């Protein structure tokens, strides 16, 4: 059974090559029944089986099963793009996930996969199989290959692949030099938005967004796959933190905070030209010109027919629910939005997912915003164009408009949050615990250093129909020197205590260099870490390494570095180890800063663990990046609201962060200093 489970990973190898061809560096071949071959290969089944099987080092016989009805998922053409935001695509994917989840054992799943891989759109097949592997009890422990490894065309300049194919065909494996990905290739310096392209187009950040939506799908016949603990609240908080981080990056680069796109009839000021090619669709991703507008959609091929005015209706109904602090249910009654579960319900309404309390009334606001933005260039399909990057969770964060749309979404959530009663002293203080200081230890005290770093990602598994062997792409990304937090705490109770340490960071001044009120600064507070800590009586010195952040996952997990896997690199068996790919990339933990040193404030709070804890066993679970991703098959590991204590405003609009501080909190003025130098991975401090 273990072999059969591992064999599933071969379906991710070279996704456009038929599964009867050799897979993996160890030349594995699936021996499929004759009637599994598509019509174009049926007459050649024996020839193909012998051709690829003779050189195989391992043959995997495929069980002949009664095949399920694949009529619905096969409605998406093999060479089209696939979007979770398009309702028709969502329905097709939900059906395929249901089929994969319904297979009685791994052997049957392997069998239906071999049939589907030859017929189903590769993007949809990859997504649905990934969701099934994550959620089936008999496939847990499998590490799904990173999407950037399987479909690298979604993450980097299309010119890279011409060079990569040349290298693959001309140079033998083992002698190939990495192919360089330029750091700036979508615009030049006359475009102000290009100053933050390093953030928007970062491979790790886009992988995070893709993987988050993989862990939290919003449609499935199996409701339990979608209905995870505090899923709607996590949708709110993860995206709120993205907008907070993006705004801080903009401020570091002399740009104003991102403007919400709240007037759906207004022109979109920002254009975007992605410079990506789809290897499945054999098309260039369409651009969006500056000044584009949302237009009524009438795309029969996608079964999308919707008026822009519908967005206004859904928005107004959503705002009405917040004003009333109650949502309208399908039966006509009203369900109150309380301070504990209200944000979770609103998150499910906004996204929206199948667990939306009333999708018929509140609609599909967030998703359809993505769809309208993705089709500004061809709203009625007259030019036979497919959607732009806003239509794909793996590419959407590249587009400046993603942040304008999600700033609007976050502003709506914030209206609800501002209606909640400000936290009282009792909700904030931890009697007997006094934080006397917090600081950062690094090369220089309370100074964070950032720089450029070059790393590599494997392309070989995604280069279909080319000679085998490793082909690396070298790309440049932001990085920071590692550091540690030093927190001095005094426990005056005379007994042992447990606390939850919460660490945030925000700019010290606004876009104009002026001090910020608490209510403005709190929305720029980015979470850096959260962990439980024993506090013995008297003075405690807490040291916490930045690499242990509860927000991030390391480079090796973001990019599935083959050298870090157990076993022989390149084999399916090497991929099985306890792994979770959802988490903010660690190299983007700290904003870029400036050459002069960008002023930020570091905040630490220690709350009472007895008020925060969730009783559950976390042994063997993936829990090292829980802040933005939760924990697989467990409850969110913090009873407090996500973003606490900055998710609510203070009653006094003029109050500052210093007015907010309690004895169990401390702040420190710090600086982020950027050095415009580039180092190879492993060379930074």
Curated annotation (Swiss-Prot):
Q: Which EC number applies?
A: 1.14.18.1
One Pfam family, please name it. Answer: Hemocyanin_C
Q: Which reaction does it catalyse?
A: 2 L-dopa + O2 = 2 L-dopaquinone + 2 H2O; L-tyrosine + O2 = L-dopaquinone + H2O
- Reply yes or no: does the keyword Metal-binding apply: yes
One GO CC term, this protein? extracellular region
Q: Keywords, A to Z?
A: Copper, Disulfide bond, Melanin biosynthesis, Metal-binding, Monooxygenase, Oxidoreductase, Secreted
Q: Which PROSITE patterns match?
A: HEMOCYANIN_1 (PS00209), HEMOCYANIN_2 (PS00210), TYROSINASE_2 (PS00498)
Q: How is the cofactor bound?
A: Binds 2 copper ions per subunit.
Q: Where does Cu cation A bind?
A: 209, 213, 239
| BP GO terms, sorted | defense response; melanin biosynthetic process from tyrosine; positive regulation of melanization defense response
Active site, renumbered: 351 (proton acceptor)
Which region is the signal sequence? none
Annotated residues for binding of Cu cation B: 366, 370, 406
Q: Which cofactor does it need?
A: Cu(2+)
Q: Where is it chiefly localized?
A: secreted
Q: Where in the cell is it found?
A: Secreted
GO molecular-function terms, A-Z: chloride ion binding; copper ion binding; tyrosinase activity
Modification after translation is described as: The N-terminus is blocked.
InterPro entries recorded: Di-copper_centre_dom_sf, Hemocyanin/hexamerin, Hemocyanin/hexamerin_mid_dom, Hemocyanin_C, Hemocyanin_C_sf, Hemocyanin_N, Hemocyanin_N_sf, Ig_E-set
Annotated coiled-coil positions are none
Give the top-level enzyme category.
oxidoreductase
Function comment: This is a copper-containing oxidase that functions in the formation of pigments such as melanins and other polyphenolic compounds. Catalyzes the rate-limiting conversions of tyrosine to DOPA, DOPA to DOPA-quinone and possibly 5,6 dihydroxyindole to indole-5'6 quinone. Binds to the surface of hemocytes and is involved in hemocyte melanization.
Q: Subunit notes for this chain?
A: Heterodimer. Forms a complex with an interleukin 1-like protein as a consequence of a host defense response.
Q: Which family does it belong to?
A: Belongs to the tyrosinase family.
Name the record gives this protein: Phenoloxidase subunit 1
From the broadest rank down, the organism's phylogenetic lineage runs:
Eukaryota, Metazoa, Ecdysozoa, Arthropoda, Hexapoda
């Amino acid at each position: 059974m273990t072999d059969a489970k591992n064999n599933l990973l071969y379906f991710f190898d070279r996704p456009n090559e038929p599964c009867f061809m050799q897979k993996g560096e160890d030349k594995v071949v699936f021996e499929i029944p004759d009637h599994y071959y598509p019509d174009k290969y049926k007459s050649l089944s024996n020839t193909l089986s012998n051709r690829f099987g003779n050189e195989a080092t391992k043959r995997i016989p495929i069980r002949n099963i009664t095949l399920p009805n694949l009529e619905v998922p096969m409605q998406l053409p093999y060479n089209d793009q696939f979007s979770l935001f398009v309702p028709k695509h969502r329905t097709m994917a939900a059906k395929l996930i249901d089929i994969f989840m319904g297979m009685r054992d791994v052997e049957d799943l392997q069998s239906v996969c071999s049939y589907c891989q030859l017929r189903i759109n590769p993007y949809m097949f990859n997504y649905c199989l990934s969701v099934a592997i994550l959620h089936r009890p008999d496939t847990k422990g499998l590490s799904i290959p990173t999407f950037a490894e399987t479909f690298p065309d979604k993450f980097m300049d299309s010119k890279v692949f011409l060079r990569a194919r040349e290298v693959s065909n001309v140079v033998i494996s083992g002698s190939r030099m990495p192919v360089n990905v330029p750091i700036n290739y979508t615009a030049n310096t006359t475009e102000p938005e290009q100053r933050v392209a390093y953030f928007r187009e970062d491979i790790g950040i886009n992988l995070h967004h893709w993987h988050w939506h993989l862990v939290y799908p919003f449609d499935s016949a199996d409701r339990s796959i979608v209905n995870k603990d505090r899923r709607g609240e996590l949708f709110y908080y993860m995206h709120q933190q993205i907008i907070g981080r993006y705004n801080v990056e903009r401020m570091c680069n002399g740009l104003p905070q991102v403007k919400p796109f709240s007037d759906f009839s207004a022109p979109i000021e920002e254009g975007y030209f992605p410079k990506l090619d789809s290897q499945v669709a054999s098309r260039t991703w369409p651009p969006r010109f500056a000044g584009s507008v949302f237009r009524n959609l009438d795309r029969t091929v996608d079964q999308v027919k919707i008026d822009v005015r519908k967005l206004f209706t859904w928005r107004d109904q959503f705002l009405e629910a917040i004003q009333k602090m109650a949502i309208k249910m399908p039966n006509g009654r009203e369900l109150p939005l309380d301070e504990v579960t209200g944000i979770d319900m609103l998150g499910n309404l906004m996204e929206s997912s199948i667990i939306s309390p009333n999708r018929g009334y509140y609609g599909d606001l967030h998703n359809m915003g993505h769809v309208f933005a993705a089709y500004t260039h061809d709203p009625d399909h007259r030019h036979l164009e497919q959607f732009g990057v806003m239509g794909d969770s793996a590419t959407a964060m590249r587009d400046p408009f993603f942040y304008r749309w999600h700033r609007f979404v976050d502003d709506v959530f914030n209206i609800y949050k501002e209606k909640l009663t400000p936290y009282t002293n009792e909700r904030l203080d931890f009697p007997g615990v006094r934080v006397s200081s917090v600081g950062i230890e690094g090369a220089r005290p309370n100074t964070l250093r950032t720089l450029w770093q070059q790393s590599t990602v494997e392309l070989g598994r995604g280069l279909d129909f080319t000679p085998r062997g490793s082909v690396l792409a070298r790309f440049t990304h932001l990085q920071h020197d590692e550091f540690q937090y030093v927190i001095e705490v005094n426990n005056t109770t005379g007994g042992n205590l447990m606390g939850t340490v919460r660490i945030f960071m925000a700019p010290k001044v606004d876009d104009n260099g002026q001090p910020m009120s608490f209510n403005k600064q709190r929305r720029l507070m980015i979470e850096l870490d959260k962990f439980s800590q024993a506090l013995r009586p008297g003075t405690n010195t807490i040291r916490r390494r930045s690499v242990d952040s509860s927000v991030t996952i390391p480079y090796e997990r973001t990019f599935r570095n083959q050298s870090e896997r157990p076993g022989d690199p390149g084999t399916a068996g090497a991929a099985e180890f306890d792994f979770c790919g959802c988490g903010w990339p660690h190299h983007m933990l700290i904003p870029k800063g400036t050459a002069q040193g960008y002023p930020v404030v570091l905040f630490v709070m220690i709350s009472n663990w007895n008020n925060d804890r969730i009783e559950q066993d976390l042994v063997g679970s993936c829990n090292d990046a829980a802040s933005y991703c939760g924990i697989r098959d467990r409850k969110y590991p913090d009873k407090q609201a996500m973003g606490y204590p900055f998710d609510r405003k203070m009653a006094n609009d003029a109050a500052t962060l210093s007015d907010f501080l309690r004895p169990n909190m401390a702040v420190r003025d710090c600086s982020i200093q950027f050095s415009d130098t580039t180092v190879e991975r492993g060379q930074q401090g």
